[in-house]
Design a protein with these regions (language model features):
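N-terminal secretory signal peptides and thylakoid transit peptides that target proteins
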Residues: 1-20
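Hinge/lid segment of periplasmic solute-binding proteins
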Residues: 36-42, 109-162, 186, 213, ...
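Conserved C-terminal helix/tail region of periplasmic/extracytoplasmic solute-binding proteins
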Residues: 42-43, 69, 78-79, 118, ...
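Extracytoplasmic/periplasmic substrate-binding proteins
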Residues: 112-115, 212-216, 243-334
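Long, aromatic- and glycine/proline-rich binding clefts that accommodate carbohydrate-like moieties
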Residues: 140, 300-302, 350-408, 413, ...
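Extracytoplasmic/periplasmic solute-binding protein
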Residues: 148-156, 161, 186-232, 274
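Glycine-centered hinge/linker elements that transmit conformational signals in sensory
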Residues: 188-195, 229-258, 303
Length: 438
């Protein structure tokens, strides 16, 4: 897929609306032709209900709703969209799957589909068609979307995390560029605190930011929850080293981070209370849209590499699940394929300035990643990530460990001094073992 210009992306987003110039007859013909080209056709009389998480970036919701309306216009299938808080999507999805009633499509997190794979619509044909059209899936996306060789969900992308910092404060701290390793990160954090601009990283049960940076912290030092055979492997010198690093890092933090959820670091950064955090592009988006003076000073950098010597990152992967109880499985496939197709996906990424990083390789050429250099660090988040089940396989156990915030809690306990690093990792291993015995 060649690189598209921003003008071309905007034209894609216009879609069938450009047919308005043809008059009502021409518009009807254009709509019918576009619908005929859709590879997955809905059932006659289908109607859908979709549940998704509440947006952090307004452009995401605006273009999503337009794409839904466009689908309805093309197919005649009405779609009701419900929005839930990030923390509430997971339990609501689990209840719906288990009672066999609820939304036809649920957009959930990480490996949620692996908790109830047999209660989902087989999406293999949809995934294979999208992969052929758009350069293939990144390895992490394939890992999350498949189980035993079958696609059980369609990765929508990942709300990528990067280091978000104030460029002027970085220089005041004596750094010309953001450190590329964890040792340099600790030096920077100490310097920022000394200058009155402390860092702040979420250590509460935050679905996104808390999970993302604590898994990176563990993995970047060589730690892991389980080995390749899904056997608990938390207790190790590498895990202890990661928790000792967390303790030193925490000493530089602004007070209160152990209770922070996904919105807290955004608010603290925009208020000028912290000079560094791990976050999505939403902070920059809010500053730009709000015309805040700090927008020009906000910078982004990829998460530093730790002692393992290579990127070991987790990002907030979100997946579209077709629920097996749906009366309209063909319409479910049709809508999901439609939303993932370039005519809808690329303009949606543009509108949200890259809040979601693509799971399909061809979409890396979207000009949203290069039109503003501050967007670029988020472009490769899915390419750089591994699954939260590392180093084992995804499944019920990995999903439950994630839902129970085992890694976040372990890091928070060791960092804050509630437990020693040894005590924290031993407690975490017991929790991991409980799930992996099932």
């Amino acid at each position: 897929m060649r690189k598209l210009s921003r003008r071309e992306v905007i034209k894609l987003g216009a879609g069938v609306t450009t047919g308005a110039a043809l008059g009502s007859a021409g518009m009807s013909f254009a709509t019918s032709a576009a619908a005929a080209e859709m590879p997955f056709k809905p059932e006659p009389g289908a109607r859908l209900r979709l549940l998704r998480w509440k947006r952090f970036v307004q452009g995401d919701e605006d273009l999503f709703e337009k794409n839904i309306a466009k689908f309805t216009k093309l197919t005649g299938v009405p779609v009701r969209v419900d929005h839930e808080s990030w923390e509430d999507v997971r339990p609501k999805a689990a209840v719906a799957a288990n009672i066999g009633s609820g939304p036809d499509i649920i957009i959930a997190w990480y490996d949620d589909p692996h908790q109830y794979p047999d209660k989902l619509i087989d999406m293999t044909d949809v995934a294979e068609d999208l992969g052929k059209r758009y350069g293939g899936w990144y390895p992490a996306a394939r890992t999350y979307g498949t189980r035993n060789g079958r696609w059980i969900s369609i990765p929508w992308g990942a709300a990528g995390n990067a280091m978000v910092y104030r460029g002027s404060w970085l220089k005041e701290a004596g750094f010309e560029r953001f450190p590329e390793d964890t040792a340099g990160l600790l030096k920077l954090c100490r310097a920022l605190k000394k200058n009155g601009h402390p860092p702040g990283f979420a250590l509460g049960n935050a679905v996104g930011d808390g999970n993302v940076w604590t898994h990176w912290l563990l993995w970047s030092h060589g730690g892991k929850l389980v080995d390749e055979n899904n056997q608990p492997a938390v207790v190790s010198p590498e895990t202890e080293a990661s928790l000792e690093f967390a303790r030193q890092l925490y000493e530089t933090f602004i007070p209160g981070t152990t209770s922070w959820l996904d919105a807290n670091n955004n608010k603290a950064f925009l208020a000028g209370k912290i000079g560094l955090t791990a976050n999505g592009i939403s902070v920059y988006y809010a500053a730009k849209k709000g015309k805040l003076p700090i927008a020009s000073d906000i910078q982004h950098a990829n998460l530093p590499v730790g002692p393992v010597g290579r990127p070991m990152e987790l990002h907030l992967l979100t997946q579209m699940m077709g629920m097996g109880y749906s009366k309209y499985p063909k319409a479910v496939k049709s809508l999901i394929h439609f939303l993932m197709s370039k005519e809808q996906y690329l303009p949606w990424q543009q509108a949200s300035i890259g809040y979601i990083t693509q799971p399909l390789k061809a979409y890396a050429s979207n000009p949203v990643w290069t039109e503003d250099p501050k967007h670029t660090p988020y472009r490769d988040c899915v390419a750089r990530m591994v699954s939260n089940g590392y180093a084992g396989a995804l499944g019920y156990a990995s999903a439950q460990v994630m839902a129970d915030y085992v890694v976040v809690n372990m890091v928070a306990e060791a960092a804050s001094g509630t437990l020693t690093p040894k005590e924290a990792m031993k407690r975490a291993e017991k929790r991991v073992a409980r799930y992996y015995r099932i």
